[in-house]
Design a protein with these regions (language model features):
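Short beta-strand to alpha-helix junction loop
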Residues: 129-137, 169-187, 196-198
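A glycine-rich dinucleotide-binding beta-alpha-beta segment and adjacent secondary-structure elements
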Residues: 164, 168, 205, 391-469, ...
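N-terminal Rossmann-like FAD-binding beta1-loop-alpha1 element of flavoenzymes
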Residues: 8-36
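A conserved short coil-to-beta-strand element within the FAD-binding core of flavoproteins
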Residues: 156-157, 197-208, 212-217
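FAD cofactor-binding and catalytic pocket of flavoenzymes
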Residues: 106, 258-383, 420-421, 429-434, ...
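N-terminal FAD cofactor-binding segment of flavoenzymes
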Residues: 32, 39-95, 138-144
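Rossmann-like flavin
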Residues: 81, 85-162, 365
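Glycine-rich loop(s) and the adjacent beta-strand/alpha-helix scaffold that form part
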Residues: 23-28, 33, 40-45, 190, ...
Length: 500
């Protein structure tokens, strides 16, 4: 086993790990040894082909189909230089004040999170897209919402030079998306931070990581030779995702008891819904996610967003199979799509564990409230589709494959909880949160408000697993803001932590 030694090791390079790497870059420039260990590959620009199955295999854990223990929801999260920011659509929102107040984390206040969020939005070139970049799918959603009186807003997006290829979720082929792979990581590397790709951290010991390097046969080879490594560090920052970070800590021999570790996992359970129009819809050009509707967030517990996915993902997310399924897929060029997100509660039994091999297992049970939110979201989406001119709608909790426009007034009657069958419809999630939640103490949390693991002064967490309860928005910028706080605490304690 080879040996390496650093002052700080950061595990993961996504929104959290990338932000920490950039914020600790001044320490590297001053001579401290800092490394980012990333499980995934760094692809060459020519490898961003936009081919759905190829890119899913290269950039996602389990090709985007990591399934829960109950087999009722699949989880999509990235594994790459840049983490999930490589495959994210770039929507960037500041978390609502009310959400932070509901979290009730001592030492965490909204003004601080908002200030840091605004700084990262500026750094990532977040802005509203011009009208010509808003494709027809997005325009139809906005028009339908406005016709019905539903509040609708445009998403700020983190792009520079967007060419409207609509391939955001497969990795931007035009180098336009300003994820950590484009912004924070290159700046960190320029200051002397080492980034080691294809490096999976298996477990932690006392101020050390045990890691394995394997090159997958695509992307750039790792900076380290393939093999096993013991990596010693004076401080370790874990930013391996809401699935990976709890699993890593559970595999490790920590010197403290943390009963909340892995628990309080939330996910914004999502459905991809489609309406068919009587004419082709120009939806595969322009940014795929330009508008959102939070009209029902407080009353019914869900958000609606525009989306446009690819043939395999779309086919997987339609309920049923056979003639009607094939008929709808043949008319994919007439589809309007809406993504619905349920705002789920943080429950101790929704959790990440590890199996006998140490691999993560996510346990997630849907509450009656979340199921009712999904039904309500399908009804609202059907109304938007019909208001926008759709001739028929496919809703997974209806008593039929298609609801025709003639029955538009009957959506409440046709889409019901009775017809929502878990395991018979495709529920997905890409907003994975919790498992190493922040809080006051070890009884019901894993870290303090600055990401330090309770009772372990050299160990920090800096990713979406910190989120103590549902973020109620797309959490990307919030993750960066929380990670920025973690980096600040490491810098402030550098004299103590990094003393030789």
């Amino acid at each position: 086993m080879r040996e390496k030694s650093y002052d700080v090791v950061i595990i993961g390079s996504g929104a959290g790990g990338g932000a920490v790497a950039k914020e600790l870059a001044p320490l590297a420039a001053a001579g401290k040894r800092i490394a980012v260990l990333e499980w995934g590959p760094k692809l060459a620009e020519s490898e961003y082909t936009g081919r759905e199955l190829e890119m899913a295999k290269k950039l996602y854990v389990d090709s985007g189909g990591f399934i829960t223990a109950e087999r009722t929801m699949t989880l999509a999260f990235g594994r790459a230089y840049g983490g999930s920011t490589v495959v994210y659509t770039g929507t960037s929102l500041i978390i609502p004040r009310a959400t932070i107040e509901k979290w009730r984390v001592p030492g965490l206040d909204w003004e601080d999170v908002a200030r840091r969020s605004r700084a990262y939005m500026a750094e990532n070139n977040v802005h509203l897209l011009d009208d010509e970049q808003l494709n027809e799918n997005n325009r139809l959603f906005a028009a339908g919402c406005e016709k019905l009186g539903y509040r609708v807003e445009q998403f700020p997006i983190n792009v520079k030079g967007c060419k409207g290829s609509s391939l955001c979720n497969l990795g931007c082929p035009n180098a336009a998306k300003q994820g950590t792979h484009r912004v924070q990581l290159p700046r960190a590397e320029a200051a002397g931070v080492e980034v080691v790709t294809n490096c999976k951290v298996e477990r932690l010991g006392d101020r050390e990581c045990i890691a394995t390097v394997r090159n997958p046969g695509f992307g750039e080879p790792s900076a380290w030779e393939p093999g096993e490594y013991r990596v010693r560090a004076k401080a370790i920052v874990v930013a391996a995702s809401a699935v990976g970070s709890p699993a890593l800590l559970l595999r490790s021999r920590l010197p403290v008891r943390l009963p909340a570790l892995g628990r309080y996992f939330t996910a914004h359970p999502a459905l991809i819904l489609v309406g068919e129009h009587p004419r082709p819809i120009r939806s595969f050009y322009g940014h795929p996610k330009s508008f959102y509707c939070d009209h029902f967030a407080a009353s019914d517990g869900f958000l609606l967003e525009t989306c446009m996915y690819f043939p395999f993902v779309t086919a997987k997310n339609l309920a049923g199979f056979g003639k009607e399924h094939s008929e709808l897929m043949r008319r994919m060029n007439r589809m309007q799509m809406i993504l619905v997100l349920a705002l789920d509660p943080a429950l101790p039994d929704n959790r990440v564990t590890v199996d006998r091999a140490g691999e993560p297992v996510v346990h997630y049970r849907f509450t009656p409230t979340v199921l009712r939110s999904l039904v309500a979201s399908m009804r609202a989406s059907a109304r938007i589709f019909f208001a926008a001119g759709a001739s028929r709608v496919h809703a997974p909790a209806a008593d039929r494959f298609f609801i025709d426009a003639a029955d538009a007034a009957r959506v409440d009657e046709l889409i019901t909880l009775e017809h929502l069958k878990l395991g018979k419809l495709s529920i997905t999630s890409a907003h994975l949160m919790g498992g190493c939640r922040m809080g006051a103490g070890p009884a019901d949390s894993v870290t303090d408000a600055w990401g330090q693991v309770h009772g372990v002064p050299w160990l920090f967490v800096a990713d979406s697993s910190l989120v103590p309860a549902c973020a109620e928005i797309n959490p990307y910028i919030t993750i960066m803001a929380l990670a920025d706080r973690v980096a600040q605490r490491v810098r402030e304690r550098a004299g103590e932590l990094l003393a030789s």
